[in-house]
């Protein structure tokens, strides 16, 4: 009987500890995007938890934010997220149409940037080059828009 009570207590303590750890490992990720070429439009920031859709399909992002521009920079904050591996992709929607405009070859006509300032060789950068570890503590990224 004592053994069962001790086992139940140990299990309850482990579950409570795991729940507390999970709650503690959530934090806000803020992204500051600078070097925009104008104050026109808005900045779209997408947070990806995997390579699915990265960086061209924001509908597959874990979170998508539209952020205003002031003094040729913008700041986006993502809702609290769990510790883990993520990548961020941002673009300057200069004309405010809610999408990244491209030329007839599929090359962006508006500014883009991804975390780690990763570059692709013949196309968009891969998730593996842009990914970073998020500890769960509030933190920030500073990105410079490229055109």
Regions found by a protein language model. Give the residues of each.
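A short, amphipathic beta-strand motif
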Residues: 27-36, 143
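Bacterial N-terminal signal peptides that target proteins for export
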Residues: 1-9
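Bacterial N-terminal signal peptides
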Residues: 8-16
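Sec/Tat signal peptide C-region and signal peptidase I cleavage site
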Residues: 16-24
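Short strand-edge motifs at loop-to-beta-strand transitions and within beta-strands
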Residues: 72-76, 128-130, 139-141
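Short, flexible loop/turn segments at beta-strand junctions in immunoglobulin-like
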Residues: 78-81
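Acidic, glycine-anchored loop motifs typical of Ca2+
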Residues: 94-102
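A short tyrosine-centered beta-strand micro-motif
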Residues: 84-90
């Amino acid at each position: 009987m004592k053994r069962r009570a001790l086992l139940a207590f140990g299990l309850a303590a482990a579950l409570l500890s795991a729940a507390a750890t999970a709650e503690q490992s959530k934090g806000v990720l803020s992204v500051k995007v600078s070097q925009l070429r104008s104050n026109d439009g808005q900045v779209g920031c997408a947070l990806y938890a995997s390579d699915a859709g990265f960086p061209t399909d924001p509908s597959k992002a874990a979170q998508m934010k539209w952020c205003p521009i002031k003094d040729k920079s913008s700041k986006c904050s993502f809702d609290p997220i769990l510790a883990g591996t993520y990548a961020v992709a941002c673009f300057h929607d200069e004309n405010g149409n809610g999408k990244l405009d491209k030329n007839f070859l599929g090359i962006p006509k508006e500014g883009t940037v991804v975390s780690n300032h990763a570059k692709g060789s013949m196309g968009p950068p891969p998730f593996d080059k842009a990914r970073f570890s998020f500890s769960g503590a509030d933190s920030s990224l500073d990105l410079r828009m490229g055109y």
